[in-house]
């Protein structure tokens, strides 16, 4: 089964492969978990699936995900940890958090999203680069790499010293534009998928009246939080080229960083996440699906970083973004 999943290849245009690393097919296989009655759901096949990473070598897909609970058998936890250390290819999700919502018969859809098996489906939504949106807000929609107008032609910020009070209104305006564009493009993609029945055979295996979620995602999350934190708590000076476009930043002073158990940074993270999903929810979603968002763990951070210039948190231009919800250090 694992071998079959590894053999699947989609015919895709080069620009698609430039955006998604590893030629993904979005296949996730879950192992482990604890039943609603308290019994372990670990079987011999759980060990066999994990062992494929050792006898066949690591691979991004199928995405092997351990539904983790402290109540899992000790030997299984040790074996999963051993495979993780040797292959760096195992994903862990908190079964204790998800089980009260979805029960014990749930699957991980795409990458990280729980869905009740046979009763729910997800329209995959990739992710929006909220860090690049911050740079667009500062430069009035001008792209710092292409040197052309890509976002809406809003007034750029012209002050040399950048503060959050100055940048925030422009950023909110740019985020609102991005959320609308994001949902519109996803609606088009999902409509065309249904029109050409790419997944017809899979859909035949689940309930007729299925609950649909409309997934969105965020790229550059920790850098975005840290950049806002720098604007709030440090001194950030814009460095401009001869045309006046900001291409770099000089940041002086300390500022709280995401991932250090500092409420000042964590409050920014919560604000950013809630603000963006609220903007997404303002728009009609395909087939009345329920909007959701996630901060994914997959590796598109590299290709997103190649398109994103220097940022106020100190990250250099065109370097990888921190993956998913991970801190930027």
Task: Please state what every model-predicted region is.
Residues 1-329:
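Conserved catalytic cores of very large enzyme subunits
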């Amino acid at each position: 089964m694992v071998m079959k999943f590894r053999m699947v290849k989609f015919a895709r245009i080069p620009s698609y492969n430039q955006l998604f690393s590893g030629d993904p097919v979005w296949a996730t296989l879950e192992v482990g978990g604890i039943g609603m009655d308290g019994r372990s759901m670990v079987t011999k096949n759980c060990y066999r699936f994990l062992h494929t990473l050792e006898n066949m070598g690591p691979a991004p897909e199928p995405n092997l995900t351990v539904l983790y609970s402290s109540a899992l058998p000790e030997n299984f936890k040790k074996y999963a940890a051993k495979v993780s250390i040797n292959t760096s290819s195992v994903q862990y999700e908190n079964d204790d958090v998800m089980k009260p919502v979805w029960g014990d018969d749930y699957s991980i859809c795409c990458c990280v999203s729980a869905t009740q098996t046979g009763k729910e489906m997800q329209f995959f939504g990739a992710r929006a680069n909220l860090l690049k949106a911050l740079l667009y807000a500062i430069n009035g929609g001008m792209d710092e790499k292409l040197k052309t107008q890509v976002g809406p032609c809003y007034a750029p910020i012209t002050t040399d010293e950048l503060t959050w009070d100055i940048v925030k209104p422009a950023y909110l305006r740019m985020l609102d534009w991005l959320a609308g564009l994001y949902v519109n493009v996803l609606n088009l993609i999902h409509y065309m998928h249904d029109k050409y029945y790419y997944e017809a055979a899979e859909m035949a295996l689940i309930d007729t009246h299925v609950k649909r979620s409309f997934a969105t995602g965020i790229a550059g999350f920790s850098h975005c939080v840290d950049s806002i934190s720098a604007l709030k708590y440090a001194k950030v000076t814009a460095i401009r080229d001869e045309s006046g476009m900001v291409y770099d930043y000089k940041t002086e002073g300390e500022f709280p960083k995401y991932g250090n158990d500092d409420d000042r940074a964590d409050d920014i993270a919560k604000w950013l996440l809630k603000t963006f999903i609220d903007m997404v929810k303002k728009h009609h979603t395909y087939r009345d699906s329920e909007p959701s968002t996630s901060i994914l763990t997959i590796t598109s951070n590299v290709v997103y970083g190649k398109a994103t210039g220097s940022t106020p948190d100190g990250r250099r231009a065109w370097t990888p973004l921190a993956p998913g919800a991970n801190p930027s250090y």
